[in-house]
Amino acid sequence: MRKYFGTDGVRGVANTELTCDLAYKLGRAGGFVLAQGDHRVKVVVGKDTRISGDMLEASLIAGLMSVGCDVITVGIIPTPAVAYLTRKYGADCGVVISASHNPVEYNGIKFFNKNGYKLDDEIELKIEEYIDDIDKIDCLPIGENVGRKLHEHCAQRDYVDYLKSIISTDFKGLKVVLDCANGASYKVAPIVFDELGASVISINSSPDGNNINYKCGSTHPEQLQRAVLEHNADLGLAYDGDADRLIAVNEKGQIVDGDHIMILSALNLKKNNKLAQDTLVVTVMSNIGLTIAAKENGINLSTTAVGDRYVLEDMVKNGYNLGGEQSGHMIFLDYNTTGDGVLSSLILANIILQEKKPLSEIASIMSQYPQVLVNATIKNENKNKYMEYPEIKTEIERIESILDGNGRVLIRPSGTEPLVRVMLEGKEEGQIKELATNLANLIQEKLS
């Protein structure tokens, strides 16, 4: 049973749950496990713009260096950039200090292995063992054997150049609005679009340590919708705090979510004979409309549990090269080993230019069923107990009977917050909203 690592690393409220002491122990235990005693380990460390990032970075690095790891800091940079730079710099591991789309008070620490993939479960469990018994680590290097720290000033440039190498199209004539969520993409995204020739308007690109994800970015695209219309832009692109996800807005100011972007990307790859096994990997949260569009266009779907971790596992295991989530995590495995919001946005812009049609027109290939998501706030320890209550089970069965095969109910505990997410999908939005709200209220009442 995991104690510290969740679905996306170790997360919590910075300085109370994710403390400096825990960050130090994560560095010390992680460095020791990854070293395996046979060579001097090199670790790439990046972060997003949260005020707690510097504090946790200092503690984490102290832990790593205390067991002889050499650390390459790359500063504020998207999570997928750390995955890429870990490979480019020949490091043994990469670490990101970020809580992605979560509010500023949260932070997280996530490890990548030398190939840019998330650590295997067994390694995370081994790290947890040492965290709980830190004195078992009998590694106290002295003198020249203590770890060194080096800051890589070219890290951002290296990532931008790599992204540009993937795109062969000139973006001249394309007007884009970028919502950087006051997060890790605030420099990289505008630079790469500008250097590819696009006309760029950036919003929420002035981080102050406290405004990351605040009423902006991929989880709050309303500001972007207004900006696209105000500037008469061709496209709006919203990232989250660590830029591992993307939500788009078409030229009419309408949201284009991960499902739409995935089906467009899959069709583009298939058209160019580059979609591995003609298969797109999605999660159970993807809209029924995506299933229909895929079937009509000869694209196979492989469906996993919610979480880009499970999408990636399926892709690697079965040799697929495209997968993602409705929330905007999209993995283009030919280019990177994790969700990459900036890469996804470049690929979407490239598709629009290749098709020579507005996004609203090309995205109409998929019709979206109404989908309602309501959160039930509960005690964290009760997240997985909802089916233990007969009243909740009975209400779910009642809703399924009402939908009668023309929709579905999906209940999912959050991997990072004290929430149970209730999702309903069906033909009539008013009906499913009422049903979802009632079910969420019942779950909250029983599990709070």
From Swiss-Prot:
Its cofactor is Mg(2+). Gene3D superfamilies: Alpha-D-Glucose-1,6-Bisphosphate, subunit A, domain 3, Alpha-D-phosphohexomutase, C-terminal domain. Catalyzes the conversion of glucosamine-6-phosphate to glucosamine-1-phosphate. Its EC number is 5.4.2.10. Activated by phosphorylation. The gene is glmM. The modification Phosphoserine is found at S100. Binds 1 Mg(2+) ion per subunit. Mg(2+) binds at S100, D240, D242, D244. One of its GO terms (molecular function) is magnesium ion binding. Belongs to the phosphohexose mutase family. PROSITE patterns: PGM_PMM (PS00710). This is Phosphoglucosamine mutase. It catalyses: alpha-D-glucosamine 1-phosphate = D-glucosamine 6-phosphate. The keyword Manganese does not apply. It comes from Clostridioides difficile (strain 630). The active site is at S100 (phosphoserine intermediate). Keywords: Isomerase, Magnesium, Metal-binding, Phosphoprotein.
